[in-house]
Amino acid sequence: METVNNNLQQFLHFQKVERGLSNNTIQSYGRDLKQYIQYVERVEEIRSARNITRETILHYLYHLREQGRAETSIARAVAAIRSFHQFLLREKLSDSDPTVHVEIPKATKRLPKALTIEEVEALLNSPQGRDPFSLRNKAMLELLYATGMRVSELIGLTLSDIHLSMGFVRCLGKGNKERIIPIGQVATEAVESYLANGRGKLMKKQSHDHVFVNHHGRPLSRQGFWKMLKQLAKNVNIDKPLTPHTLRHSFATHLLENGADLRAVQEMLGHADISTTQIYTHVTKTRMRDVYAHFHPRA
């Protein structure tokens, strides 16, 4: 008998090979579904997907709430479970889709935190040295703020993606979707300086074409970038909550605050749905209200 665990491996393979989803998305699916399957097998004592019912899933969601999971976390789990069971039905590995009448809890969209322009300038000016690490860190921060790309896209850049003389970079976003993003003079100079005077020294005996590397000469990881960002933010006394996406959020917010077209920002960010980009318009409206309340004599 085919087990639910076997089905999970088939599902993840399909998402990677057939749909071309990113490794981060695959890992997220895997984490949520492994927890779900563990519950189904251990608590409900179900081994086959054909025996999973709507009640099974509702029990699992109740279990997540008892654990104190946030609605956003539960909504993500339901989305993964639904996608999994739809796949099983399509592949005739199940007789029905038990998620049909299971509603996804509405997750309240939290507004992304953006740095002020002054905070961004302080952060970007923090790597001051001419050593390879300072040149690398400066190039990464300038490029992130200049393009709004995701950290996973930044660390995935290869030498053939960088077109400094033409003023753009090419990056592969979610689902391997390619996009071309313009970059300004400051970011161009920072990347040029790193490539000319930093990368070669960090590479040591390694041989690959990733742009940003660690002290072993290997491609930099997300964890490596995150560690660097936290340290630099601490150096310039930025005490706001930071995430690896902070500069991406700041890029979008500052463009819109200065009158950029929403569709153009959507394209640069690589958002499939403009409603995702519209979150940033709420950020700018919140900022406007704060300015009004602070400076208007009759506010």
Curated annotation (Swiss-Prot):
InterPro entries: CB, DNA_brk_join_enz, Integrase-like_cat_sf, Integrase_catalytic, Integrase_recombinase_N, Integrase_SAM-like_N, Recomb_XerC, Recomb_XerD
Keyword DNA-binding: yes
Domain of life according to the entry: Bacteria
Residue stretches making up the Core-binding (CB) domain: 2-89
This protein's GO CC annotations: cytoplasm
Compartments where found: Cytoplasm
Keywords: Cell cycle, Cell division, Chromosome partition, Cytoplasm, DNA integration, DNA recombination, DNA-binding
Active site residues per record: 150, 174, 245, 248, 271, 280 (o-(3'-phospho-dna)-tyrosine intermediate)
Family matches, as PROSITE patterns: CB (PS51900), TYR_RECOMBINASE (PS51898)
Presence of keyword Cell cycle: yes
Residue span(s) of domain Tyr recombinase: 110-293
Any one biological process term the GO annotation gives: cell division
Main location: cytoplasm
A GO molecular-function descriptor: tyrosine-based site-specific recombinase activity
Subunit structure: Forms a cyclic heterotetrameric complex composed of two molecules of XerC and two molecules of XerD.
NCBIfam families tied to this protein: PRK00283.1 (NF001399), recomb_XerA_Arch (NF040815), recomb_XerC (TIGR02224), recomb_XerD (TIGR02225)
Task of the protein: Site-specific tyrosine recombinase, which acts by catalyzing the cutting and rejoining of the recombining DNA molecules. The XerC-XerD complex is essential to convert dimers of the bacterial chromosome into monomers to permit their segregation at cell division. It also contributes to the segregational stability of plasmids.
PANTHER family: PHAGE INTEGRASE-RELATED, TYROSINE RECOMBINASE XERC
Annotated family: Belongs to the 'phage' integrase family. XerD subfamily.
Protein name (Swiss-Prot/TrEMBL): Tyrosine recombinase XerD
Organism per entry: Halalkalibacterium halodurans (strain ATCC BAA-125 / DSM 18197 / FERM 7344 / JCM 9153 / C-125) (Bacillus halodurans)
Gene: xerD
